[in-house]
From Swiss-Prot:
EC numbers on record: 3.5.1.5
One Pfam family hit: Urease_beta
Highest taxon, organism lineage: Bacteria
Cellular compartment(s): Cytoplasm
Organism the protein comes from: Burkholderia cenocepacia (strain HI2424)
Keywords for this protein: Cytoplasm, Hydrolase
Pathway: Nitrogen metabolism; urea degradation; CO(2) and NH(3) from urea (urease route): step 1/1
HAMAP family: Urease_beta (MF_01954)
Protein name: Urease subunit beta
Amino acid sequence: MIPGEILTDDGEHELNAGRATLSLVVANTGDRPVQVGSHYHFFEVNDALSFDRAAARGFRLNIAAGTAVRFEPGQTRTVELVALAGERAVYGFQGKVMGPL
């Protein structure tokens, strides 16, 4: 085994199976690119991103761990979010929650 190597079974694997998801239209209203990582609490992303923030509370991007989505200035795109799992408490990021969801 190589450090960091991931060994999986053959076939397809569904990420985040059975978890609540939602789609949101997101626009970068700023003049610089914004990149959002896979596990960032989407409610607390850069304020230059315009979308229904209240709907995004408790959700993150529904993408593979360690990846990110980049929003270029003026770009609008639809993203799929997935509900946070585990204890459903958020600490850090921009400090807008700092506790249970």
